[in-house]
A protein has these predicted regions:
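Conserved beta-strand positions
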Residues: 5-7, 29-31, 98, 133, ...
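Conserved beta-strand positions in the central sheet of alpha/beta enzyme cores
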Residues: 30, 59-61, 97, 132, ...
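Active-site acidic/histidine proton-transfer and metal-coordination neighborhood
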Residues: 15, 67-161, 171, 252, ...
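Acidic-and-aromatic substrate-binding clefts and catalytic sites of carbohydrate-active enzymes
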Residues: 8-15, 32-43, 65-75, 103-108, ...
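A structural motif
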Residues: 26, 55, 88, 93, ...
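Histidine-acidic metal/acid-base catalytic patches
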Residues: 1-4, 11-25, 51, 92, ...
Length: 463
């Protein structure tokens, strides 16, 4: 499935949005009309920019309050549609997304709606265009995807298809099993969004609290399994209305979005997300915290060593080539790094004395790194000295590092290989035995980012 995101999901002007979408690695983009209206250029300019960035323009949206209108509004609706078709031809897209009517003037009836969609399909076909029909969860007469599918089915037009939007489906708690019976070639667009479960009206919920897949509470894996049974292989697009996202870094939010789509397709049989889709290694099981590393200067290192000793930790070794000491109690390993070169030194300059890295023992360190990189985590590496072991690592919260170790590679010998044993007697009994959990502090606005980051890479749940 082609990965896509609607421009309404991001902050910034249209050029900034398109640049961020392309840089993140999306295959396509949905153009939201407001972004086009505020752009200082022509629709043709927008289309050229999209193509120059290597993106496909998936759809132009939204076209509102169309089906079921009485005269003279019905005639005007078709006139509006023709003007949208003009824009689409300039933009270079063949798909117009039509939302179910919310106008109090609209008339009900699936046959009436189907007739209108069929006529719109005729007009679109004459210009080589297509129509995708979506049921808004607050639609006046059509608010259920099963009804929007019935309208499309009755319209019986090759240029008229269905939009499945996970928010509108799940906000109404509609059963998902009917999706599997819809022919995949009649689904023209799939829009995915997650959200926390909230008791509020659907419109406000939709406009302010949508989030990326994996950040909310919707059963999106079940949706994807049903979608896979249809044979659908079209765009999988994010349409996210979220106040926080629209005030955050355009590039970071776009990257989170693509990560969420890759994660959404992970492990779903018959689903390949992205034009360069590949099978991911399984989620990493973090067996234990292998070590915690502190970045400090020399004076603080002495004070920290005294504190550790007072807490019952014993110095087990000193690094053979660096100003680094290893302290241990039970299965807890603490590292004090006051070396004047390398990552820890730079981290201390920026952050002051602090934890700069956490090492996690996993089943397979290389596979964990591969999965993390496939999910767009930034890998970390630095120069490795003679006799040292290179540990796989990724960037974590606040620019810190997360290292990966395992039992079946040279990583299991890192303490013996890199450290000279301390000449101290070891006490027989430890009062502290293990690290129970790792807790990170972060800005509130970063919570959803790091939630998705860690739960997509590791076998973790949300509490």
């Amino acid at each position: 499935m082609l990965t896509s995101i609607a421009t309404v999901s991001l902050s910034g002007d249209l050029q900034e949005k398109l640049d961020a979408i392309a840089a993140a690695g999306f295959d396509g983009v949905e153009i939201f009309e407001n972004d086009l209206l505020s752009f200082d250029g022509s629709p043709a300019d927008v289309g050229k920019t999209i193509r120059d960035l290597g993106l496909k323009l998936v759809t132009f949206q939204p076209f509102r309050d169309f089906e079921g209108m009485p005269e003279p509004q019905r005639t005007r609706a078709f006139e509006r549609a023709e003007r949208k078709f003009d824009l689409m031809e300039e933009l270079g897209t063949d798909l117009l997304m039509v939302c179910s009517n919310v106008s109090p003037h609209s008339l009900g009836g699936l046959d009436r709606a189907a007739k209108d969609l069929a006529e719109l399909g005729d007009r679109a076909a004459k210009r080589g265009l297509r129509i995708a029909f979506e049921a808004l969860s607050w639609g006046k007469h059509i608010s259920d995807y099963r009804d929007s599918w019935e309208v499309v089915r009755r319209a019986n037009h090759p240029n008229v298809g269905l939009v499945l939007d996970t928010f509108h489906i799940m906000a109404r708690k509609v059963p998902l099993d009917a999706i599997s019976s819809i022919p995949g070639d009649k689904i023209f667009l799939v829009q995915v969004a997650d959200a926390p479960i909230l008791e509020m009206d659907a419109l406000s919920w939709s406009r302010h609290f949508r989030c990326f897949p994996g950040q909310g509470d919707f059963p999106l894996a079940e949706f994807m399994r049903n979608l896979a049974m249809t044979g659908y292989d079209g765009p999988l697009s994010l349409e996210i209305f979220n106040d926080q996202f629209r005030s955050s870094s355009t590039k970071n939010v776009a990257k989170d979005g693509l990560r969420s789509l890759i994660y959404l397709g992970d492990g779903i049989e018959g689903v390949k997300v992205g034009e360069k889709a590949k099978t991911l290694p399984p989620k990493a099981h973090a067996q234990e915290v292998a070590f915690v590393e502190f970045a400090v200067e020399e004076e603080t290192a002495d004070k920290l060593a005294k504190l550790f000793a007072g807490l019952g930790f014993e110095k087990r070794g000193s690094h053979k080539t660096k100003a680094v000491t290893w302290w241990k109690q039970g299965d807890i390993n603490l590292v004090i790094n006051c070396d004047k070169d390398g990552f820890a030194h730079s981290y201390n300059i920026v952050h002051g004395p602090s934890v700069c890295a956490v090492g996690l023992k996993v089943d397979d360190a290389k596979a964990t790194l591969d999965r993390a990189q496939s999910l767009l985590a930034a890998p970390f590496s630095q120069a490795v000295g003679e006799g040292e072991i290179e540990m796989p690592a990724i960037r974590g919260v606040g620019g810190s590092l997360v290292y990966f170790l395992d039992d079946h590679s040279e990583l299991s010998r890192i303490w013996d290989v890199e450290f000279e044993p301390a000449r101290t007697e070891q006490s027989a009994k430890a009062k502290l035995r293990a690290v129970d959990h790792v807790s990170y502090s972060m800005q509130y606005e970063e919570m959803l980012t790091w939630l998705l980051y860690f739960t997509s890479i590791f076998d973790l749940g949300k509490m």
